[in-house]
C-alpha cells in the first residue's frame, strides 16, 4: 500500500522506492499521494506489466523487491465484476510464477524478495521462489489473535540463497482484548512521536 510506503519514507530519509503496477488508476493514485507528501524525488511509480520488466530495467537493479500479489488463481473464489478489483485479487494478469521470475530478474545476487500471501498458497509460493532461483529464507505467519489460525504469511526469498528457512514466531495483530500488539505498534511507528 502506498500509505505504508509514505510512512516508511518519512522515517528513512535514505530510502528510495520504485513502484510497479499494471493498473493506470492505481499508479495515478500512488503518484498523487507521493506528490502530496513531497516524496516524488524518492518515490516513483511505473505503469508496466511486470512480465515485461526486462524491457524497462536492467537485471540486478534492486536490493529488495516487495510484493502484495493477487491471492487467488484465475477462476477461483468469488470473481468480481469490477475489472480493477479482479486484477488486484486474482492472477488474471500475472501468475505467482511470473511475479517470482520478475522479482528474481530485478534483484542483485543476494537480494531479498518479500511477499505476503494466503496460507493455502504456501507450497505454490515456495516452489515458485525456487523455480525463479530464489531460496525461501524466512517465513512468518500472521494471526489476528493468539487463538486464531493464520490468515496470511510473510516470506523472504534470497536470490541465489542456499537452502534453509528460518520459521519465525507468528506476527500477532491483536492481544486477547482486541488491542493492537506492541509489535504491531512498533511496525507502524505508533510507539514513536512523529
Where are the regions that the model predicts?
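Short, small-residue-biased leader/transition segments that mark boundaries at the very start
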Residues: 1-2
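Conserved SAM-binding motif I beta-strand of class I
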Residues: 16-21
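Conserved SAM/SAH-binding beta-strand->alpha-helix loop
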Residues: 23-25
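Conserved SAM-binding strand-loop segment of SAM-dependent methyltransferases
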Residues: 38-51
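A short acidic, Gly/Pro-enriched loop at the edge of an enzyme's catalytic core
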Residues: 55-65
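Mobile active-site "lid"/loop adjacent to the S-adenosyl-L-methionine
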Residues: 60, 69-98
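Conserved Class I SAM-dependent methyltransferase catalytic core
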Residues: 92-150, 154
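SAM/dcSAM-binding transferase cores
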Residues: 147-194
